[in-house]
Amino acid sequence: MDPVANSCVRNPQPPAPVWGCLRNPHSEDSSASGLSHYPPTPFSFHQKSDFPATAAYPDFSASCLAATPHSLPRTERIFNEQHPAFPQTPDWHFPISEAGQRLNLGPAGSAREMGAGSPGLVDGTAGLGEDCMVLGTIANETEKKSSRRKKERSDNQENGGGKPEGSSKARKERTAFTKEQLRELEAEFAHHNYLTRLRRYEIAVNLDLSERQVKVWFQNRRMKWKRVKGGQPVSPQEQDREDGDSAASPSSE
């Protein structure tokens, strides 16, 4: 630190010539007596057209100015009156009541100020709450649906003998032949155990049946006849004829 600054700090009441120079910088007597201890330095805050750049003023450092706080306002006011071109220095002193209130707010007050001063934060918190409610509702609906499905599945298993629906194939309805149809079919079977394709077509047209119905009836009748006959094995020729008739008959379904 500068020895002059140390002297100013140690002695809060500087000698009169120095403060006289500060009060009237253009005074010749003060400059003659006060500037002997302080070298002249160019004072350049902001160079203006109406302020000479070559003017020399004493270098009053921040330490010297801070040494006597009770005399700062007066010196500053005198300097501002003599040089109005310079900007006014802001007042850095805060009211004690306001500072105390800020310190005494605590976490709760700060949170309230933040909530009141930032509506976006409050809106975001509310939006998060609504999202959580929506997610909870969706989860509850999903659980209800899953429980309902389990209940329906258990009921179906109890009613269907433990088998799920659609697993067992639906049996085809059996053809209900009339007495007249059965009589004609039995008469034809007595003459011919196997039918040609043309004869099968004629019988189907005469009895108002499909060729497949006639073919299936003759197959069932031959099986019954073989069982009644004593379980004799079917000859290869009869088997070939039956297979040929089955392959030649078109499907009527």
From Swiss-Prot:
Organism field: Mus musculus (Mouse)
Compartments reported by the entry: Nucleus; Cytoplasm
Entry comment describing in which tissues the protein is expressed: Heart, lateral plate derivatives, kidney, loose connective tissue at sites of bone formation and skeletal muscle-connective tissue apposition.
Gene: Meox1
Alphabetical GO biological process terms: hematopoietic stem cell differentiation; positive regulation of transcription by RNA polymerase II; sclerotome development; somite development; somite specification
Region named Disordered: 1-44, 139-177, 226-253
Function text: Mesodermal transcription factor that plays a key role in somitogenesis and is specifically required for sclerotome development. Required for maintenance of the sclerotome polarity and formation of the cranio-cervical joints. Binds specifically to the promoter of target genes and regulates their expression. Activates expression of NKX3-2 in the sclerotome. Activates expression of CDKN1A and CDKN2A in endothelial cells, acting as a regulator of vascular cell proliferation. While it activates CDKN1A in a DNA-dependent manner, it activates CDKN2A in a DNA-independent manner.
Name the record gives this protein: Homeobox protein MOX-1
UniProt-listed PANTHER family: HOMEOBOX PROTEIN MOX, HOMEOBOX PROTEIN MOX-1
Lineage: Eukaryota, Metazoa, Chordata, Craniata, Vertebrata
GO molecular function, one term: HMG box domain binding
Feature: compositional bias, Basic and acidic residues: 166-177
Regions recorded as binding DNA: 170-229
Disruption phenotype: Mice display mild defects in sclerotome derived vertebral and rib bones. Abnormalities are restricted to the sclerotome and its derivatives and are characterized by a remodeling of the cranio-cervical joints, leading to the assimilation of the atlas into the basioccipital bone so that the skull rests on the axis. Mice lacking Meox1 and Meox2 show extremely disrupted somite morphogenesis, patterning and differentiation. They lack an axial skeleton and skeletal muscles are severely deficient.
Superkingdom of the source species: Eukaryota
Single GO cellular component term: cytoplasm
Keyword DNA-binding assigned: yes
Record's keyword terms, sorted: Activator, Cytoplasm, Developmental protein, DNA-binding, Homeobox, Nucleus, Repressor, Transcription, Transcription regulation
